Amino acid sequence: MIDKSGYRANVAIVLLNKQNRVFWGQRRNRTSWQFPQGGVDTGETPLQAMYRELHEEIGLRPQDVEVIASTRDWYKYDIPDSLVRTKEPICIGQKQKWFLLKLKSPESYIDLDANDSPEFDNWRWVSYWYPINHVVYFKQEVYRKALTYFKEYIA
């Protein structure tokens, strides 16, 4: 869903392990790394989209995680001009609802090949703040906002 301003509705997932390290995935056939994320389909709530993306991208089901928190606001970022879709509807960026999850199941349940079009080639656990300086530059500010917002929920 792309709104009138050109922003695609999207959910992003920060998945914690027991040591409060976060899941960090390498995009398929690319050198870039990021958190799991994906679009909100028409008629879908952000929570429903989050669970769908969680399964599509890393193979986890609702029973494998605990939802700790979600952002109140949608965080927006613009994409570089070279990535802007010029066909209707024009997409200039994404607005994201963020979710903080805790992994309850063994990490062996993480399955990057859970669907026919995997999003990630590789993954690892990284320290909580690591992603801010290692995600693609145009996402850094939304990562900073989300991780700062969630910090109060981490024991």
Swiss-Prot record:
NCBIfam families: PRK00714.1-3, PRK00714.1-4, PRK00714.1-5. Belongs to the Nudix hydrolase family. RppH subfamily. InterPro entries: Nudix_hydrolase, NUDIX_hydrolase-like_dom_sf, NUDIX_hydrolase_CS, NUDIX_hydrolase_dom, RppH. The lineage of its organism: Bacteria, Pseudomonadati, Pseudomonadota, Gammaproteobacteria, Thiotrichales. This is RNA pyrophosphohydrolase. The gene is rppH. GO terms for biological process: nucleoside phosphate metabolic process; ribose phosphate metabolic process. It comes from the Bacteria. Its EC number is 3.6.1.-. Its cofactor is a divalent metal cation. Accelerates the degradation of transcripts by removing pyrophosphate from the 5'-end of triphosphorylated RNA, leading to a more labile monophosphorylated state that can stimulate subsequent ribonuclease cleavage. Keywords: Hydrolase. Residues 6-148 form the Nudix hydrolase domain. The keyword Ribosomal protein does not apply.
